Regions:
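Terminal-region recognition feature
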Residues: 1-146
């Protein structure tokens, strides 16, 4: 049986996707599976509700999910059930609209990572982190208008 990385709860016009867990990693939310299932659901449902409870995770896996949600023909509504931290907060930007309980949390931070290597390799990683930070700031600014 295929492992499902999130649950889909159908209704006549709306699919509800539960995006719970860490994005990326061995046991986390797999972007390839999510994106392929999202495209499948978008072809069957006019609206997709995405319920988020995630500490975040891989920036690049999250970007793939973000881009798929943004490109979807379905109307995407995001509900933050518990926490949308780190990359999950970026995925939450896809909602038109976004709903959040007064008890839920939205948490942001600059991207981070590590590396081993010589000074040129370390400098390249620092430059990549700066570029990612600029990209993420643009994404937040686009949603908030600030």
């Amino acid at each position: 049986m295929k492992k499902r990385y999130f649950n889909m709860i159908p209704s006549p016009d709306t699919a509800c996707i539960l995006l719970y867990g860490e994005i990326g990693g061995f046991d986390g939310i797999n972007d390839k599976d999510i994106v392929s299932e999202l495209y499948e659901y978008a072809s069957m449902y006019r609206s997709i509700d995405v319920r988020v409870n995630s500490p975040g995770g891989s920036v690049y896996a999250g970007m793939a999910i973000f881009n798929a949600l943004r490109a979807s023909d379905a109307d995407i509504t995001i509900y933050i059930d518990g926490i949308a931290a780190s990359m999950a907060s970026v995925i939450a930007l896809c909602g038109k609209p976004v709903y959040m309980s007064q008890y839920a949390r939205l948490m942001l931070h600059s991207p981070y990572g590590g590396c081993y290597g010589n000074k040129e390799e370390m400098k390249a990683v620092a430059e990549q982190l700066e570029a990612l930070e600029d990209t993420l700031a643009d994404m937040y600014a686009s949603k908030t208008g600030k």
